[in-house]
C-alpha cells in the first residue's frame, strides 16, 4: 500500500480585501473623484447598481439621482469632481430618460462642482441638441468625448503708477517762473449799433431762382385727391381744387338727365288727354264717334256708362251712380 500525502490549504476562505477596481476612464491618479448621475429607473435594479460599484471604486465615486438634483434636493460640493458620467447604458437604453432630466437647473448645479479640466460624458457618448446647447450656455466646452470645463484664468490686480517725470522736473526747478505781462487795458468806449444791418450773411449759397427749371414750371401740379373718412360718403371740400367737386357735379347732372328722360316716356300729349280731360270742348273720345254730350255711346267709347255732360261740368259718383 503506497503512502498517502496530505496537503494543507493556508489561503483564507473569505478575503476582506476590496475587489480590484475597474474604471472605464483612466483618471491617472487614485485621488480623482467621479460622480455618477443615474436616472430614477436604475434604483429598482440591484444588479445594475452592483455592477456599477464593481466597476468604480467606492472610495472615490459618488452616485446621485438626476431627478433629485433637478428638484434641488441635493447640494453638490464645489470644485470636487474630475469626471461626471451620466448613466445611459452602453446601448443607450436609458438615454431618453437621462437626457430628459439634463435641464438647465441640473447644469447649474453640476458646473460649480466640477474641477478645472473635469469632463462630462455619457455611457453611450451621445448628447442631444438641446443638451449640448444647455451645456455650452453653462460654460462647458464641447470635445470629442463629451464636454469639458476649462480652467478659469486667474485674475490679479495691476497697480497703476503715475508718471514720475513731471514730479522730478518740478523738484529740480527751484526758481519761480517770471510773471507774464498783463495785457493792456482797453479804454471804455460807447458802441454804435447799426440799425440797417440785418445781421444776415449776404452771400447766398444757393440761388432760389435756379431751383426750378422752365420744364418744372410748365409741368401741371396734380393736387392730392380728397379722401373721405372711413364710413362716410365721399364729398368735396368747400374750396376743392382737385377736381372732385366738378366730377361729382357732372355725375349728379347725368343722373338728373337720366331721371328726366324716364319721366318724358310717361308724358301724354294733348290728343291723348281727350279721354281723361272732360273740359275740352268739341272733342270726341278715342272711338271718334261719341262726344261728351251724347247720351247714347257706342261699345268702344271710353265714356260708356257715363251720362251726357257738358265740358267743365263736375261729375260725382255716389253709390256707383253718376251725379251731375
From Swiss-Prot:
The annotated region (N-terminal SAM-like domain) lies at 28-158
Q: Where is this region: Fe-S binding site B?
A: 287-301
Motif residue range(s): Cx2C motif 1: 287-290
In chain numbering, motif Cx2C motif 2 lies across: 298-301
Residue ranges for the region (Linker) are: 159-217
Q: Which GO terms describe its cellular component?
A: mitochondrial intermembrane space
Q: Where does [2Fe-2S] cluster bind?
A: 226, 237, 240, 242
InterPro entries assigned to the protein according to its UniProt record, in alphabetical order: Anamorsin, CIAPIN1, Dre2_N
Residues the record lists as binding [4Fe-4S] cluster: 287, 290, 298, 301
Obligatory cofactor(s): [2Fe-2S] cluster; [4Fe-4S] cluster
Give the molecular function GO annotations.
2 iron, 2 sulfur cluster binding; 4 iron, 4 sulfur cluster binding; electron transfer activity; metal ion binding
UniProt-listed Gene3D superfamilies? Fe-S cluster assembly protein Dre2, N-terminal domain
Any Pfam family the entry gives:
DRE2_N
Main localisation: cytoplasm
Q: Where in the cell is it found?
A: Cytoplasm; Mitochondrion intermembrane space
* Residue ranges of the region described as Fe-S binding site A: 226-242
Which residues form each disulfide bond in the chain? Answer: none
Q: Name one GO biological process term.
A: iron-sulfur cluster assembly
Into which family does the record put it?
Belongs to the anamorsin family.
What free text does the record give on domains? The C-terminal domain binds 2 Fe-S clusters but is otherwise mostly in an intrinsically disordered conformation. The N-terminal domain has structural similarity with S-adenosyl-L-methionine-dependent methyltransferases, but does not bind S-adenosyl-L-methionine. It is required for correct assembly of the 2 Fe-S clusters.
Write out the function statement from the record.
Answer: Component of the cytosolic iron-sulfur (Fe-S) protein assembly (CIA) machinery required for the maturation of extramitochondrial Fe-S proteins. Part of an electron transfer chain functioning in an early step of cytosolic Fe-S biogenesis, facilitating the de novo assembly of a [4Fe-4S] cluster on the scaffold complex cfd1-nbp35. Electrons are transferred to dre2 from NADPH via the FAD- and FMN-containing protein tah18.
Subunit structure, per the record? Monomer. Interacts with tah18. Interacts with mia40.
Q: What is this protein called?
A: Fe-S cluster assembly protein dre2
- Species this protein is from: Aspergillus niger (strain ATCC MYA-4892 / CBS 513.88 / FGSC A1513)
Starting at the broadest rank, the lineage of the source organism is:
Eukaryota, Fungi, Dikarya, Ascomycota, Pezizomycotina
